[in-house]
Regions:
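C-terminal motif of bacterial Sec signal peptides marking the signal peptidase cleavage site
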Residues: 19-23
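Extracytoplasmic small-molecule ligand-binding "clamshell" domains
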Residues: 36-108, 257
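Periplasmic-binding protein-like
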Residues: 49-50, 127-134, 212-249, 268-280
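Extended ligand-binding regions for polar small-molecule ligands
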Residues: 68-78, 138, 145, 150, ...
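Ligand-binding cleft/hinge of the Venus flytrap
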Residues: 71-80, 160-182, 211-216
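Acidic, polar ligand-binding/catalytic clefts
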Residues: 72, 84-146
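Short helix-initiation/N-cap motifs at beta->coil->alpha
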Residues: 84-95, 139, 178-191, 228
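A ligand-binding cleft/hinge motif common to bilobed small-molecule-binding domains
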Residues: 92, 109-117, 163-166, 193-194, ...
Length: 280
């Protein structure tokens, strides 16, 4: 399967106390073992931050969204695995995979070399181009060539933050201003609309969803040219090779039988599937 680096992503790789995770994972492993002994199936715990919509979110107290429903379809009628979702902070997604608390995660996760060294990437389930967002009355930013001296908000550890940090290394004479935050994407977009900073780089689907749902009509979206196809992937803990093979096969089947297309239309309002060759 071809791996493709995504331009930006919502997420931030943070730190969680190792002792707390170790204590939690010990208890959860015992619970999982009890569940497996009862059902005869292996329990797979899938972590998510339940954001951004429409990829992952809560509705009436229940998790849903494109990636959540794809996972449900992957494990539907499996005679080997039972799937369970657990909501956690973004930093907890990765820390939980590290501690074997979770076997899998879905959270609009992009491909990076650093993550590929620590985790297993399943086949991609969606494509999600990146865009530049500014206020409609701001004509000073028309492309990435114009962000020098302009300000944005980023979450520490995201691929967008790292990309802009690299931009600043290459443009020391006129760097872009990075304001680090722990706010979620909806809050960040609201502050952009209020004029608290100048621009935001993010995923097209997430941007268009927030603009529509929050009524941020004073923002405009600028397409970013890229010869790389930004994809979204399920991520698995190291050592879960057998699970990865199962997930990859099921994603291929769901692509061929039209399930992925149906879910894409339902949650994205259009076809945002990877190229078939990249799923194999």
């Amino acid at each position: 399967m071809k791996k493709i680096i995504k331009y930006s992503s919502l997420a931030a790789l943070g730190l969680v106390a190792a002792g707390v995770l170790a204590a939690c994972s010990g208890g959860e492993k015992k619970d999982a073992a009890t569940s497996e002994a009862t059902s005869g199936k292996k329990e797979i715990i899938v972590a998510t931050n339940a954001s951004p919509k429409p990829f992952n979110y809560e509705e009436n107290g229940e998790l849903t969204g494109y990636e959540i429903e794809v996972v449900r379809a992957i494990f539907k009628d499996s005679d080997k695995y039972d799937v369970k979702f657990e909501k956690t902070e973004w930093s907890g997604v990765f820390a939980g995979l590290d501690a074997d608390r979770y076997q899998m995660a879905v959270n609009n996760i992009s491909y990076t070399k650093e993550r590929a060294e620590k985790y297993l990437y399943a086949a991609p389930t969606a494509k999600n181009p990146n865009v530049l967002v500014v206020k409609k009355d701001d004509n000073s930013i028309k492309s990435l060539d114009d962000i020098g001296g302009k300000s944005t908000e980023v979450v520490q550890g995201t691929t967008s933050a790292k990309q802009l940090e690299e931009y600043n290394k290459q443009h020391t004479d006129n760097p872009t201003v990075l304001n680090y935050t722990k706010a979620d994407f909806q809050q960040i977009m609201g502050r952009l609309s209020d004029g608290q900073f100048d621009y935001k780089i993010f995923d097209k689907i997430g941007v268009e969803t927030v603009i529509k749902n929050q009524g941020l009509d004073n923002l405009k979206v600028i397409e970013l040219p890229s010869d790389q196809q930004p994809y979204v992937y399920p991520l698995l803990a190291k050592g879960q090779d057998e699970l990865k093979a199962f997930v990859d096969k099921r994603i291929q089947e769901l692509y061929k039988d039209g399930t992925l297309e149906k879910l894409s239309q339902q949650f994205f309002g259009g076809s945002y599937l990877p190229a078939e060759a990249d799923i194999k």
